């Protein structure tokens, strides 16, 4: 399996491209100077483009990915607000950008050439909008509004238009602050990490109504410092889930029940200082975490049984790394 890891470092305005081998070792392929503070990133479903959000000139930049995983800037388009999170629909026709500061989510079309265009739609009133997450069926967009303790639910049509569902939202606990999400491969359950209380909620998304079925504390009992969760990801086989907390500088390891409805904490892995983002490779064997204050990334081996993390190596990147994405080239 040929994989490339991309890391975004906004303080030095750089993207680093790393080759990930089958033993979990990284080799630096390329350092790209980005046109601004690069933060959120996503790989297109066809694996041929990397879309990134940059500040302070708010725009989405498209990089073409060559056969080795190297990047070449191919085009850009304006955004209506500061990009906090970026994602695509499952068919690679639309880009969704959540903006925390501008309290909105926008829809950007992707042309047949893979390049972004002018925004098609901007949905406002999403206070603290922190991500936009399309389900595996490519039908419902889940948009956490952190400051409102809710996740807004939108239907996506073939033209890229978002319309509030009959069930327009689900609520989290007061003060939880929903942030990022992950979906179980069986398409029946979703998981959201809450920034302000470092909890993880489990949602049954299999029926017409989205229902919360569990909420789990992601920090050890007795943790008394400020809670500040950031990211969440699931292994491709749906057996293990991970979340990170920036104050604790740890990654919480969960096992997932067979049907996906229940989480159990398996352990806590100390990691790079202030882990803002991490990701899991396509084989489900490795996790790569970025330390926003350590200016390093660290690679871990995922154990097959409980999902525990074994540190392999750490690598210096740019300043203030915030985002990690992994592309499978073959």
Curated annotation (Swiss-Prot):
GO function terms (MF aspect): 6-phosphogluconolactonase activity
Superkingdom of this protein's organism: Bacteria
SUPFAM superfamilies, A to Z: Nitrous oxide reductase, N-terminal domain (SSF50974)
Enzyme's top EC category: hydrolase
Biological role stated in the UniProt entry: Catalyzes the hydrolysis of 6-phosphogluconolactone to 6-phosphogluconate.
Transmembrane residue ranges: none
Pfam families per the UniProt record, alphabetical: Lactonase
Name of this chain's protein: 6-phosphogluconolactonase
HAMAP family registered for this protein in UniProt: 6P_gluconolactonase
Bridged cysteine pairs (disulfide): none
Pathway: Carbohydrate degradation; pentose phosphate pathway; D-ribulose 5-phosphate from D-glucose 6-phosphate (oxidative stage): step 2/3
Protein's GO biological process: glucose metabolic process; pentose-phosphate shunt, oxidative branch
Record-level GO cellular component terms: cytosol
Family: Belongs to the cycloisomerase 2 family.
Catalytic activity: 6-phospho-D-glucono-1,5-lactone + H2O = 6-phospho-D-gluconate + H(+)
EC number: 3.1.1.31
InterPro entries, A to Z: 6-phosphogluconolactonase_YbhE, Cycloisomerase_2, Lactonase_7-beta_prop, N2O_reductase_N, WD40/YVTN_repeat-like_dom_sf
Swiss-Prot/TrEMBL keywords: Carbohydrate metabolism, Glucose metabolism, Hydrolase
């Amino acid at each position: 399996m040929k994989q490339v890891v991309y890391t975004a470092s906004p303080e030095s305005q750089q993207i680093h491209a790393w080759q990930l081998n089958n033993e979990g070792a990284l080799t630096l392929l390329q350092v790209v100077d980005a046109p601004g503070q690069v933060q959120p990133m996503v790989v297109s479903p066809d694996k041929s483009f990397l879309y990134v959000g940059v500040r302070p000139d708010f725009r989405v930049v498209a990089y073409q990915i060559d056969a080795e995983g190297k990047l070449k800037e191919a085009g850009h388009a304006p955004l209506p607000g500061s990009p906090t999170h970026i994602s695509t629909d499952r068919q690679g026709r639309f880009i969704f950008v959540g903006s925390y500061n501008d309290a909105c989510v926008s829809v950007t079309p992707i042309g047949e050439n893979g390049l972004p265009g002018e925004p098609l739609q901007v949905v406002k009133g999403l206070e603290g909008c922190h991500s936009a997450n399309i389900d595996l069926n490519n039908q419902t967009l889940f948009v956490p509004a952190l400051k409102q303790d809710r996740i807004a639910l939108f239907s996506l049509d073939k033209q890229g238009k978002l319309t509030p569902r009959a069930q327009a939202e689900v609520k989290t606990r007061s003060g939880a602050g929903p942030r990022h999400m992950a979906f179980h491969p069986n398409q029946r359950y979703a998981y959201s990490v809450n920034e302000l209380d470092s909890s993880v909620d489990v949602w049954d998304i299999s029926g017409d109504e989205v229902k919360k079925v569990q909420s789990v504390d992601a920090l050890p009992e007795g943790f008394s410092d400020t809670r500040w969760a950031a990211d969440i990801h699931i292994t491709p086989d749906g057996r293990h889930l991970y979340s990170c907390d920036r104050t604790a500088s740890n990654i919480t390891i969960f096992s997932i029940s067979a049907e996906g409805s229940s989480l159990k904490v398996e352990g806590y892995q100390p990691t790079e200082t202030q882990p803002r983002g991490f990701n899991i490779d396509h084989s489900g064997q490795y996790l790569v975490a970025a330390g926003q204050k350590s200016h390093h990334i660290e690679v871990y081996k995922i154990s097959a049984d409980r999902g525990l993390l074994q540190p392999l190596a750490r690598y210096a990147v740019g300043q203030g790394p915030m985002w990690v994405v992994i592309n499978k080239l073959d």
